[in-house]
Each structure stands twice: as C-alpha cells, then as structure tokens.
Amino acid sequence: MGLLVRRLIECFSVGTRFPMQHKIRSVAVFCGSRSGRNPEYASAAADLGRILARAGVELIFGAGHIGLMGVVADAALAHGGKVAGMIPKHLVDWELAHPGITELIITKTMHERKAAMAERADAFVALPGGFGTCDEFFEILTWRQLHLHQKPI
C-alpha cells in the first residue's frame, strides 16, 4: 500500500480530527485521461476512489470515463460514493464524459472547469497525469499562493 493511500486512510478514519476549520466533504482529484505505464497508478486511483466513497466524501473530477479519471470515478461509484464531474463542452462532443456519474456539469472552457472544481472542492489531490493534470495542479497551487483559497492540497 502506497504512502498516499496510507495517509488518506488516516485522514478519513472514523474519529480523526482535521487540523482545519471545516470538515472535508468533497475532494477534487486531478489525474490523467490515460492510466500511465505503471500499474500502481491505477491501483492508487482505485484506492482513492474507494476511500473517498467509504468516508462519505464527494469526488470532484474532470468527468472523463477513460484513464485514471475513469478508474477513480468507477471505484467511488462501486462503493456507493457521490461523484461530480466537470467537463468542457468540446470534450463532451468527443464523447469522453463518464456516463455513470452522479452529476455532470458542462462548462464552456477548460478554465471554467478548473474554477468550478475549485469552487466545489474542500481539498485537492493530484495523481499522475500529463500536461492537463500539471496545469490543473499548478493553477490550484498558484491560487493558494495568491491567497485565493486556503484549502488543503
């Protein structure tokens, strides 16, 4: 079991007190639309989806049904979790949206997608991915540096 998974289990264990002002009710997960070369990436994504669902924490993600995005969403759904996906219109047209999620929000642009995810999430997790994942992660990190939010990353 990886360090990320162990830390998440600790965070979402019953009776854990968070060193934050508010309880985490939703987590935005930034990750790849591909699974990557290392099978541990998909395993970590599945573990994360399962942990969030069992803790009653809503998964906020990029709405894709492929790659690590699909893995984390499928795992959360399989364990009774609530899953909200945000996707820009042009990606819906490519038929990339996950058909089984709890809620699908369609945005006009990628920037609106990131803003919607940030607005809805109480915390952020980044898993392996490509340039898009890096863009999402660094934008959230920059917003925190600029004091636009104080949510855990």
Give the residues covered by each predicted segment:
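Leucine-biased recognition of intrinsically disordered, low-complexity hydrophobic segments
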Residues: 3-4, 8
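Conserved phosphate- and dinucleotide-binding cores of soluble alpha/beta proteins
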Residues: 107-111, 116-119, 123-153
